[in-house]
Amino acid sequence: MISRDDITGLILAGGRGSRMGGTDKGLQPLRGVPMAMHTLMRLSAQTGAVLINANRNLAAYESFGVPVVTDSVPDFAGPLAGMLAGLEQCQTGWMVTAPCDSPFLPTDLVQRLAQAIETEDAELAIPVTIDADGRRQTQPVFCLMPASAIDSLVAYLNGGGRKIETWAASHRLVEVPFDDAAAFANINTLDELHMHESEKRAG
C-alpha cells in the first residue's frame, strides 16, 4: 500500500495566467484567501509533504510555508515542466499534482488514486469525470506518479513533447472515476472567480 507519508503533493502555479489577463492565478483571492492556499490546504491533508511550482512572485508563494520550486525547462513550457521541477526535488517515492486553481479538489483524491495504482498494478493514476452533458473528461493535471517517472519525463520534454495525456499514456495508466466533476473545476478567468465569490455570498 502506498502510504500518505511516501507521497509529495505538488501544486502547479507556474503558468502565465494568460486566460486571467496575465495575473498570477494562484495568488488571486477566493473568499479572502489566495486560490493556491485553498489548494494547499486540501492537498496537504492528503500527503506527507507539499511543494509549490512557481515561476514568478516567489516570495509570495514562499510565505505559504512550503518549499517553492521553479521550472528548469525555459519559456513557460507548461504543466509538464512544473511536474519535472517537482520530481527533481521530490524526496518521497511518489508525487501527486494539482493545479493552483483547483480549490475544491476532492478530499479523498490521493487515497483513491493510490488505491487504484495498487489494485490495477499501474504506474500512473489520473481522475476521470462525467460532465453535465454526459461527456467523459479526463483530468490529467491531477496525476499520481512514481518519483522514478522523472527519466521518461525528461526524455519526453527533451523530444519536444508538452502534452500530459501523451506522456501519461506511455506508462501503465489507470483512470479513476470520480462522481463530482465540480470538485475538479479550474478557475481560469476572473469572471469564473467572481462567479464563485457570488455563489459563496448567496449561500
Curated annotation (Swiss-Prot):
Q: What's the domain of life for this entry? A: Bacteria
A GO molecular function for this record? molybdenum cofactor guanylyltransferase activity
InterPro entries recorded for this chain? MobA-like_NTP_Trfase, Molybde_CF_guanTrfase, Nucleotide-diphossugar_trans
Q: What is its EC number?
A: 2.7.7.77
Named cofactor requirement(s): Mg(2+)
Q: Which major enzyme category is it? A: transferase
Subunit structure, briefly?
Monomer.
What family does this chain come from, according to its entry? Belongs to the MobA family.
Which protein is depicted?
Answer: Molybdenum cofactor guanylyltransferase
Annotated source species? Cupriavidus metallidurans (strain ATCC 43123 / DSM 2839 / NBRC 102507 / CH34)
